[in-house]
């Protein structure tokens, strides 16, 4: 399915000394990104926000992508509209799709207060953007005559009423504009618990037209909750849809944090249901860090264990920018980093998953392969010394070659193995590490 790169982190323009030039920085890294095997970029919100130096999750003018002088300046914190379009075109030329982050739950930075006659309260709900597109007043927000409340608010920011005909039609028109005019290929929906899944479904059923060709947008939703709640949201958003949306696998992320940081974590817990990857693999977007969890609950130790897991199992894996570029986990010149795992994912990680062995300290899984991808075997080792076991793989009389590996204080390459006539082989991994074997 490919590998997504989250191409930002919180306050990245300030941290990288490229305020209002983040799009240009991403463009400069495109050769490395494409060479590594990434297939898509997830960008931060591109709209003009309430604050000039804002990550965009407080949207003010959806159609101002860095073109109008308002809220402190012309460009967004990430750059100008021209820079954004140039980045998208360059990404397409490099073979990458680009996903926009849609913040459709709330707005911020209103130009004037208004009295809402339904509850008699004044709010900043008058929006007069310089783009002159999608101006809003109190009738666009909760409470309205169409709906008093729809899920969850975000702080004290005005909460959009998607049942209001103007809001519904404008948001769909905006999504189509991003696809057809700006060049995006899909969306990440922010805070989907704040509004009805039917709104997402309406957008996903769009057939965008670009360069004479129609296409369906990809999409993933941020439903930060339990597996059951995420599943309920997916059922609602995808009911009768011919273009289903996926969801970030937050329950799996918490397991991966415990795998990396909790002493005594039982590897057998990785094989338990209750995460999207096992229960709804076609809709699971797996991840290790993102711009939110890394600030409040980061993974501190042995993070490559988590990346080895998501880049060998089913789901659509998403790699975090800081892990790849800032914290030296790419390791492009050896087999002990994210780059080697991406290569394995793109060349071998296909077909159903099958756990061959699991106990508290050892986990062995194989992918059965599909088409021209021949599958793989993953060994995770929780011990402080080399560890392995005999397992029966799908390959008979086949040489299994280590393609990616890493261990704590031990980067020695696992030995090549041969399966016998019944597919049995003795597969090992380094101390507190992993080994990925592929058929030669």
Where are these regions (language model features)?
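Solvent-exposed, acidic/flexible segments
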Residues: 19, 77-84, 164, 168, ...
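Acidic/aromatic-lined carbohydrate-recognition and catalytic surfaces
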Residues: 1-154, 193-221
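A near-ubiquitous, low-amplitude feature marking generic local secondary-structure context
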Residues: 16, 45, 70, 74, ...
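Active-site-proximal helices and loops of the catalytic beta/alpha 8
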Residues: 28-31, 38, 47, 52, ...
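Alpha-helical context
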Residues: 17, 67, 78, 138, ...
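Glycan-binding loop/region signatures in secreted carbohydrate-active enzymes
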Residues: 6, 109-170, 236-263, 328-348
């Amino acid at each position: 399915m490919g590998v997504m790169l989250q191409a930002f982190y919180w306050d990245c323009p300030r941290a990288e000394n490229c305020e209002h030039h983040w799009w240009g920085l991403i463009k400069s890294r495109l050769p490395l990104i494409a060479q590594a095997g990434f297939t898509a970029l997830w960008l931060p919100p591109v709209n003009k926000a309430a604050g000039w130096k804002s990550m965009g999750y407080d949207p003010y003018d959806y159609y101002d992508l860095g073109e109008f002088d308002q809220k402190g300046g012309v460009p967004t914190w990430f750059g100008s509209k021209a820079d954004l379009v140039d980045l998208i075109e360059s990404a397409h030329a490099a073979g990458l799709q680009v996903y926009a982050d849609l913040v459709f739950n709330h707005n911020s930075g209103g130009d004037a207060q208004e009295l809402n006659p339904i509850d008699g309260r004044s709010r900043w709900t008058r929006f007069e953007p310089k783009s002159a597109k999608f101006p809003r007043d109190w009738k666009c927000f909760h409470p309205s005559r169409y709906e008093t409340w729809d899920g969850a608010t975000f702080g004290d920011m005005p909460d959009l009423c998607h049942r209001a005909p103007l809001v519904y039609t404008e948001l769909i028109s905006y999504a189509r504009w991003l696809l057809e005019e700006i060049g995006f290929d899909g969306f990440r929906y922010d805070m989907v618990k704040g509004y009805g899944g039917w709104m997402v479904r309406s957008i996903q059923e769009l057939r965008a037209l670009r360069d004479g060709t129609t296409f369906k947008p990809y999409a993933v939703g941020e439903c930060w909750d339990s597996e059951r709640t995420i599943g309920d949201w997916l059922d609602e958003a995808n009911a009768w849809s011919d273009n289903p949306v996926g969801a970030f696998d937050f329950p799996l992320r918490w397991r991966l944090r415990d795998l990396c940081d909790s002493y005594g974590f039982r590897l057998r817990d990785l094989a338990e249901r209750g995460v999207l990857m096992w229960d709804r693999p076609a809709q699971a977007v797996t991840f290790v860090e993102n711009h939110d969890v890394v600030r409040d609950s980061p993974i501190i130790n042995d993070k490559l264990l988590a990346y080895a897991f998501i880049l060998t199992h089913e789901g659509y894996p998403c790699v975090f920018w800081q892990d790849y570029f800032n914290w030296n986990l790419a390791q492009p010149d050896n087999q002990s980093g994210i780059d080697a795992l991406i290569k394995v994912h793109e060349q071998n990680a296909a077909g159903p998953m099958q756990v061959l062995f699991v106990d508290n300290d050892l986990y062995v899984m194989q992918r059965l392969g599909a088409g021209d991808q021949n599958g793989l075997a993953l060994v995770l080792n929780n011990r402080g010394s080399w560890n392995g076991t005999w397992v029966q793989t799908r390959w008979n009389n086949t040489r299994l070659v280590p393609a990616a590996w890493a261990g704590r204080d031990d980067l020695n390459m696992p030995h090549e193995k041969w399966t016998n006539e019944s597919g049995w082989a003795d597969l090992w991994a380094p101390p507190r590490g992993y080994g990925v074997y592929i058929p030669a």
